């Protein structure tokens, strides 16, 4: 969940960029013995985004995502057509899995689900949960911006906090939200193809629409305690480096195998 929201928070800024915008965020775990936070660096300009975290690089431009593997000097291109094909393939695989599980004796099915852990439980679960997004009235600060805290609860238990900045408090807020809607539509079309397992992604987009702003802090909770946090540490006008939104010379495209 945190990873998904970190990416969404980054993309929400991607149009605030006629002069270029630089963002930096720090992600940390409250549970693990973490020496230092994981840093994400993001550059934005004219609806384009470059996001770096270690050796991982993602570029978003012209309604297309590029994931870049710097050690291997390869990249993968993901456009709407690719998302559609991937969604269809995953949906077929899920339907086959459901059919296989339905034909298993209860004891064998329980054993398989236990072996697969929580992921399999999410795939086979059918019960709806009561999800609520509530404005708390509390405020915090991140990267010099005052934000308002919203709580996300599931069946009355807090799962997440998002501290949100109104679009108007940031450069080109209307363009920011328009880019978010366009990218969100691309992913919503993908998850809508899934017979099961797409609820989490749909809920993430729904939560962000409900708060109607840009998260600069997100915290995940388990059993009432925070376990992970992503916090913006820098938001400033800055021209991106030359070639920031280009595929590096000499990199080889890897096709997704469908």
Regions inferred by a protein language model and the residue ranges of each:
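Positively charged n-region of N-terminal signal peptides that target proteins for export
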Residues: 1-4
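N-terminal signal peptide c-region/cleavage motif recognized by signal peptidases
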Residues: 14-16
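Extended soluble regions of mature proteins
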Residues: 19-258
């Amino acid at each position: 969940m945190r990873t998904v929201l970190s990416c969404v928070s980054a993309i929400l800024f991607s149009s605030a960029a006629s002069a270029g915008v630089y963002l930096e965020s720090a992600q940390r775990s409250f549970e693990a013995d973490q020496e230092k936070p994981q840093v994400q660096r993001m550059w934005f300009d004219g609806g384009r985004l470059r996001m770096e975290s270690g050796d991982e690089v993602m570029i978003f431009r012209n309604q297309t995502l590029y994931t870049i593997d710097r050690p291997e000097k390869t990249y993968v291109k993901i456009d709407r057509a690719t998302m559609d094909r991937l969604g269809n393939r995953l949906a077929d695989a899920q339907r086959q899995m459901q059919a296989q599980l339905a034909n298993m004796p209860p004891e064998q099915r329980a054993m398989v689900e236990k072996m697969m852990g929580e992921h399999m439980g999410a795939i086979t679960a059918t019960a709806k949960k009561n999800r609520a997004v509530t404005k708390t009235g509390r405020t915090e600060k991140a990267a010099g911006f005052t934000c308002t805290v919203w709580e996300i609860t599931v069946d009355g238990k807090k799962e997440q906090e998002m501290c949100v900045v109104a679009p108007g408090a940031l450069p080109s807020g209307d363009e920011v939200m328009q880019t978010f809607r366009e990218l969100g539509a691309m992913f919503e079309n993908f998850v809508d193809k899934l017979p099961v397992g797409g609820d989490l992604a749909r809920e993430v987009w729904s939560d962000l629409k409900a708060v109607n702003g840009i998260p600069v802090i997100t915290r995940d909770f388990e059993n009432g305690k925070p376990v992970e946090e992503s916090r913006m540490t820098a938001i400033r006008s800055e021209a991106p480096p030359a070639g920031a939104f280009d595929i590096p010379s000499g990199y080889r495209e890897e096709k997704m195998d469908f």
